[in-house]
Amino acid sequence: MAATDSPAGDGAAGLRRLLLSGLVIPAHPLALDAARRLDERRQRALTRYYLAAGAGGLAVGVHTTQFAIRDPAVGLFRPVLELAAEEVRRAGRRVALIGGICGPTRQAAAEAALLRDLGYDAGLLSLAGHSGDDDDLLAHCRGLAEIVPVVGFYLQPAVGGRDLSHAFWRAFMEIPNVVAVKVAPFDRYRTLDVVRALALSGRDDVALYTGNDDSIVADLAGLFEVEGRRLRFAGGLLGHWAVDTRAAVALLDRCRPGGMDERLAIDAVAVTDMNAAYFDAAHRFKGCIAGLHEVLRRQGLLAGIWCLDEAEGLSPGQAAQIDRVRRARPDLCDDDFVAASRDAWLSG
């Protein structure tokens, strides 16, 4: 598929408008069978679920998809990108299709070129593992932005990210082909570094997306004022939204008017509590992927919680925590929605 044949259509300007409009963008999991091979039927069913739930974008080949798909012995990076793109084209509506980019510059450039060739709209650029200084990182980012539009990614150090200075983000905002930033340092001070950098850049064509799983609603309902400029997070690009996506769409709609009323404040705490269970915060996120798989397994979208790494699974007590949070807030869950259409998604 040519780069001009993006599943989302209408080029860079349309992508910027779409991202700024505010989207729920789930990070796409990987569906495996008991032999830890790709389960194409269930992989497609997941994509169909997200699109039916009202997601405005998809992030594929990212942490939730498992970085090991890039291992030549696994060989799943291109196949999972292709499956998602095919389902988006079948859906026939405007969706922001974002693929993960990681690794040293040579690897990252090859991944960016693949995204471009498959018609992806943008690359989510992980800087995890890079040890260079700000100048080295910025050169890396500029080179990739010449290949594909870039979504910056501030990843928390606890899961492989690194601290990045306000000065880095201020310079990053000057890269013309930056279309958005996923802000996920799990740190209010560092979150403000990114917001300030965007405000001071003067740009109004870069969207802020939260990845702060510990403060999703606070980010989405918040209003930031920096030297006379007011900014908001447009939406979220979240592994958390790989489950209960329809409920996430409704939640984002409630956050759009701005301001945290009492009901939204209560729900903000509930969402964080749910995230702690799914992402296994009690064990430093060891079971974060398996926790999402467990929810999808219970709903019948996945056959099991298998990960490429056989050592990955639920932590002790994590299943009970998932029971607790879903029992407490069924209104924030998609169980009925999934049950009504699951068989169609699996057979379509």
Positions of the model-derived regions?
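General structural feature for long, well-ordered alpha-helical segments within catalytic domains
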Residues: 39-42, 46, 76, 80, ...
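Catalytic alpha/beta core domains of metabolic enzymes, predominantly
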Residues: 156-288
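Active-site beta->alpha loop and helix N-cap motifs at the rims of alpha/beta catalytic domains
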Residues: 2-169, 336-337
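Hydrophobic, Leu/Ile/Phe/Ala-enriched alpha-helical segments that form helix-helix packing faces
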Residues: 50, 84-88, 198-199, 275, ...
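C-terminal alpha-helical cap/extension of soluble enzyme domains
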Residues: 3-15, 25-29, 53-54, 230-348
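Alpha-helical structural signal in soluble globular domains
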Residues: 79, 83-91, 114-118, 143-147, ...
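Repeat-unit-sized solenoid/scaffold elements
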Residues: 122-142, 187, 191-194, 221-223, ...
